[in-house]
Curated annotation (Swiss-Prot):
Gene coding for it: panB
Cofactor needs: Mg(2+)
First-tier enzyme category under EC: transferase
Organism in which the protein naturally occurs: Psychrobacter arcticus (strain DSM 17307 / VKM B-2377 / 273-4)
Record-given protein name: 3-methyl-2-oxobutanoate hydroxymethyltransferase
Biochemical pathway: Cofactor biosynthesis; (R)-pantothenate biosynthesis; (R)-pantoate from 3-methyl-2-oxobutanoate: step 1/2
Length: 266
């Protein structure tokens, strides 16, 4: 079974690892067969499962339901689960909501933000709840950003993101996710912190990669993000199957053939 210790060893050894979003039992079993290292029950389910145009309407109960479905069905992957929008504004509610997700099978709780999360990260760590802090493009803040845009461009913004990463790691964060940031910045963050860093639209130099499952199967609604590759229709997926797409993703990340330059931002 993949644990945080496994991911830390991967980072130390320079071994890349994989993460995919998942929301139900059947796909969780397929990912176990493909040996996907980590699974994220993301609040992206608001868009790809519930049909909303953002992640904002997702509730803690929604997250708990889908986390339980996945955790029951995959005993090999490290399970990450999102705390959804406005569910961790105060420390008491953050702790209560984290407990709810951990009790149904999450191993790590993912939260979005920067150095303002330090107190929460420390409290959760002291309570035995590992956290993954999501930096860069944070979808729960889409209205603040004015849309889904690359973050961390320019010296000031890049330094702010790097400082935030160091701060939350010093506070006790066990993992980081970097979304839609310049590849060179993602590399700098990955080298600057001791914990594993997972990238999405953040270049090839992060320790791990994550994609939304529906996107990497060519099921994206609307415009396909630049950082996505369709592994289902890839000619190397000789089975032309979902299981084959998961296995090809796992292989491609491990061998370093994904992501390529066209999947990253400068």
């Amino acid at each position: 079974m993949t644990t945080l210790s496994t991911l830390n060893k991967f980072k130390k050894d320079g071994t890349k690892f994989t993460c995919l979003t998942c929301y139900d039992a059947m796909f969780a079993r397929m990912m176990e067969k493909a040996q996907i290292d980590t699974i994220l029950i993301g609040d992206s389910l608001g868009m790809v499962v519930q049909g909303h145009d953002s992640t904002l309407p997702v509730t803690v109960d929604d997250m708990a339901y889908h986390t339980a479905n996945v955790a029951r069905s995959n005993k090999q992957a490290l399970i990450l689960a999102d705390l959804p929008f406005m569910s961790y504004v105060t420390l008491p509610e953050a702790i209560a909501n984290s407990r709810k997700l951990m009790q149904v099978g999450a191993h790590v709780i993912k939260i979005e933000g920067g150095s303002e999360l330090c107190e929460l990260v420390t409290m959760l760590a002291q309570a035995g709840t590992p956290t993954c802090v999501h930096l860069g493009l944070t979808p729960q803040s889409v209205n603040v950003f004015g849309g889904y845009k690359v973050q961390g461009r320019g010296d000031e913004a890049g330094q702010k993101l790097l400082d935030d990463a160091k701060a939350v790691v010093n506070a006790g964060a066990a993992l980081l996710v970097l979304e839609c940031v310049p590849a060179e910045l993602a590399k700098a963050v990955t080298e600057a912190v001791a914990v594993p860093v997972i990238g999405i639209g953040a270049g090839a130099d992060t320790d791990g990669q994550v994609l939304v499952m529906h996107d990497m199967l060519g099921m994206a609604h609307g415009r396909t993000p630049r950082f996505v590759h369709d592994f289902l229709t890839d000619e190397r997926n000789t089975e032309h199957s979902i299981e084959g797409a998961f296995a090809l993703y796992q292989q491609s990340v491990k061998e370093g053939s994904f992501p390529k330059e066209q999947h990253q931002f400068s």
